[in-house]
Amino acid sequence: MRRSLVATTVLALAFAAPAAAGLPKAGALVPGRSLGGIRLGESPQAVRAALGTFYGTCRGCPRRTWYFTYRPFDKHGLAVEFTDGQVSGLYTLWQPAGWHAPHKLGFGSSPLAVHTLTGASRTVTCNDYEALVRDSAHARTAYYLFDGRLWGFGLFQRGASPCR
């Protein structure tokens, strides 16, 4: 009986750990530190442990890039870029519901709110959108604007272009 209970517990824990991995329902941007719970410099193994193995791979991207979404072919989620085997960039895909930054800054906020609440003071113009950026010691945090509203978040190595 005791062996059976131990074996059942071990099996339950083994199957529970992978089930816990996945894209967060309400991911958070921690400026200069993390996006969706993933930090710059993490290994692919650490990303898989946190987000699971349900991701697509970008075939035309200059860096190895994984797209984590909530359902197959869904546009909403998180992109994770790798350089030399480490996370070098993270950005939201479209506007995943519930994702936010500090001060309750969410998608749809005005550029003025982004400037005021984040201190992002530099504007980088990309092809069809803009990014308000703020550099910290080791990272660049990006607040993407489209059509005059906050559209997404990004986190990159310091000085990296936020344009994708």
Residue ranges of each PLM-predicted region?
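Bacterial N-terminal signal peptides
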Residues: 7-16
